């Protein structure tokens, strides 16, 4: 069930249309919040309807507004590795570019060896992936009974093809494990 999907709005997204990143809903207070695609917006509209919004305080002390989406769909038109500078340290990030009619989306999946990026690339290697069909992306984070997390991006391709990322799939036998990173002691 997809509760909120990115569609055309009146907000400007920069040089490549609209730009999204993955973060957890209420993630500054709840480290186990539901992952969403976050899109920066100038201000939260008066009429919210069923849309989700969140305001976060940045490191510089300024507040930033975001609209949250559970899923984004479009035709995959490019995959890039972009180098981003965080506090003087370069990081390689995986970025997907989608087109949906007149709209272009840039989706930052995080570090190239992170779980969202690795899971997405495994799914795009699925032999049933058809680049001529739309993809629908939805980030997830599921905690199992032992307390460990299964984190990734669910990808539907076309009308009913869910792309697989199972380790036992023959096309994934030699793929490396995602890097486990300790962030702020966690």
Segments and roles (model prediction):
Residues 2-109, 121-127, 142-181:
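OB-fold ssDNA-binding interfaces and closely related basic DNA-contact patches used
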Residues 185-186:
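Mixed-charge, glycine-accented linear interaction segment located at domain edges/termini
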């Amino acid at each position: 069930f997809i509760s909120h999907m990115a569609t055309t709005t009146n907000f400007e997204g920069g040089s490549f249309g609209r730009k999204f990143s993955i973060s957890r809903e209420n993630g500054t207070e709840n480290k186990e919040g539901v992952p969403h695609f976050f899109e920066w917006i100038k201000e939260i509209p008066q009429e919210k309807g069923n849309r989700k919004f969140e305001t976060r305080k940045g490191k510089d002390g300024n507040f930033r507004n975001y609209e949250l989406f559970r899923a984004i769909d479009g035709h995959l038109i490019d995959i890039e590795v972009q180098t981003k500078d965080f506090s003087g340290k370069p990081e390689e990030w995986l970025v997907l570019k989608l087109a949906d009619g007149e709209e272009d989306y840039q989706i930052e999946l995080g570090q190239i060896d992170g779980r969202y990026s690795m899971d997405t690339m495994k799914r795009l290697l699925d032999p049933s992936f058809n680049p001529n069909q739309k993809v629908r992306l939805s980030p997830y984070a599921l905690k199992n009974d032992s307390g460990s997390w299964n984190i990734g991006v669910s990808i539907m391709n076309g009308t009913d093809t869910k792309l697989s990322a199972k380790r036992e799939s023959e096309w994934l036998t030699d793929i490396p494990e995602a890097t486990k990173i300790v962030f702020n002691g966690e």
